[in-house]
């Protein structure tokens, strides 16, 4: 995988998924060089974005045989992070609400403890003029794309 912070995050999330009975797969094309000049996010931002995306995906896996698939790569000088899961996904309106601080799909839980993850993801992505999108295929797919640094 290359980038040490990404390796540590993926190892930790893999262990969490295993404890929860979720099949977490890292795609074969996942790779980020450890050369920070090529990556548009600093490691802490990458952990915030990808960590929250994976957490949300694991929480959304409500089908039998739950799974999450993670892909991270540099494509055309842009950082592309994609997390797919076996959950039902969100329509466009719900996804837009989920990017607002305080909104949570996790019913019955303390509101002050939820509704921050996707808002933080969106904040980091917007700060770097990136794009955060969601699609529903067999499950849900959330993609964060951050353009490369100029210069």
Per-region residue spans from a language model:
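Conserved short strand/loop->alpha-helix "switch" segment adjacent to the catalytic nucleotide/phosphoryl-transfer site
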Residues: 25-49
């Amino acid at each position: 995988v290359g980038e040490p912070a990404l390796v540590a995050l993926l190892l930790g999330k893999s262990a969490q998924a295993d404890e929860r009975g979720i099949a977490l797969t890292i795609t074969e094309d996942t790779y980020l060089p450890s050369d920070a000049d090529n990556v548009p996010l600093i490691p802490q931002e990458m952990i915030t974005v990808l960590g929250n995306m994976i957490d949300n995906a694991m929480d959304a896996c409500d089908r039998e045989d739950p799974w999450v698939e993670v892909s991270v790569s540099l494509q055309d000088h842009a950082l592309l992070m994609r997390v797919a899961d076996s959950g039902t996904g969100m329509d466009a309106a719900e996804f837009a609400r989920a990017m607002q601080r305080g909104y949570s799909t996790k019913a019955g839980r303390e509101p002050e403890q939820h509704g921050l993850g996707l808002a933080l993801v969106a904040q980091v992505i917007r700060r770097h003029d990136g794009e955060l999108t969601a699609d529903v295929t067999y499950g849900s797919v959330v993609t964060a794309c951050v353009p490369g640094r100029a210069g």
